[in-house]
Amino acid sequence: IAGCQNVVLCSPPPIADEILYAAQLCGVQEIFNVGGAQAIAALAFGSESVPKVDKIFGPGNAFVTEAKRQVSQRLDGAAIDMPAGPSEVLVIADSGATPDFVASDLLSQAEHGPDSQVILLTPDADIARKVAEAVERQLAELPRADTARQALSASRLIVTKDLAQCV
């Protein structure tokens, strides 16, 4: 889609098996164990182990976004995708939802940064309670639990009158 002949991937260590599998499916030629603004700098300027690239795309926290912005403004800078703001997600869950899956969806955004916003809308108070319990269980295993907790402090689980009110 981006028109690149060579595709590289940077991800902080340890790189999850799921990421490695997705990279293989997408034809990624090189993978580097580096993340954050450091990865952006390595990709933008090249390093002993990471090649300089023409385009830098992908998610990241506020530091990554700022690094990408700075790189893109240089005359010799790499092209970037749209600068990202805080992560956000709104999940609508009915009585058939799996609380563990809903909790994972919420936490996948909450862990991006303390300014992330996650919201659950559901007409089922039991689902809301079970999702809240699942979030707490999963937080215990989450490497970025402190960041996710900060985001969750400003997030909401809202029980509505019915599913139509969620929409």
Swiss-Prot record:
Cofactor, how bound (note): Binds 1 zinc ion per subunit.
Keyword annotations for this protein, in alphabetical order, are: Amino-acid biosynthesis, Histidine biosynthesis, Metal-binding, NAD, Oxidoreductase, Zinc
Q: Which InterPro entries match?
A: Ald_DH/histidinol_DH, Histidinol_DH_CS, Hstdl_DH
The reply to whether Zinc figures as a keyword in the UniProt entry is: yes
Required cofactors, per record? Zn(2+)
Quaternary structure, per UniProt, is:
Homodimer.
Q: Which family does it belong to?
A: Belongs to the histidinol dehydrogenase family.
Listed name of the protein = Histidinol dehydrogenase
Could you tell me the gene encoding this protein? hisD
